[in-house]
Amino acid sequence: MAKFITRVELYNAKAEDYKVLDEAMEESGFSRTINASNGITYQLPTAEYWIEGKLLLTNVLIVVQNAARSVKKEYGVIASEIIGATWEGLLAVK
C-alpha cells in the first residue's frame, strides 16, 4: 500500500476553521495520527494528515484540495508519497 502525508495551510483562518478541516479530512479517510513501528500512535502537527491505501498521489492531492476548499477559498496544500517517516517530539496519543 502507498503511504502519503499531506499538509494544508488555510489562509486567514481561525482555529475553528482547522477543526472543520480535520473533520473534512477524516471523512475523506485521512488521519491526524501516525503509527510507529513500535506500536505507539503519535499526534501529527496541526493540519498534517496521513493516509495509506491503493491511491495515486494526484488523487490524494485532489481529495485534499476539495477538503481545504470546503473550508476556505484560499489555501495551500502539499501531498507527498513516502516510503518511510521518522520524527522527534510528536506527542503519543493516550
Q: Over which residues does each language-model region extend?
A:
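Short glycine-rich or small-residue beta-strand-to-loop segments that form or flank ligand, phosphate
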Residues: 5-9, 50
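Short, intrinsically disordered low-complexity segments
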Residues: 31-73
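Long, hydrophobic N-terminal alpha-helical segment
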Residues: 1-4, 13
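C-terminal structural segments of small proteins and small subunits
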Residues: 66-91
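Short, surface-exposed ligand-recognition loops at beta-strand->loop->(often short) alpha-helix junctions
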Residues: 9-16
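Short, flexible N-terminal segments of the mature chain
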Residues: 18-37
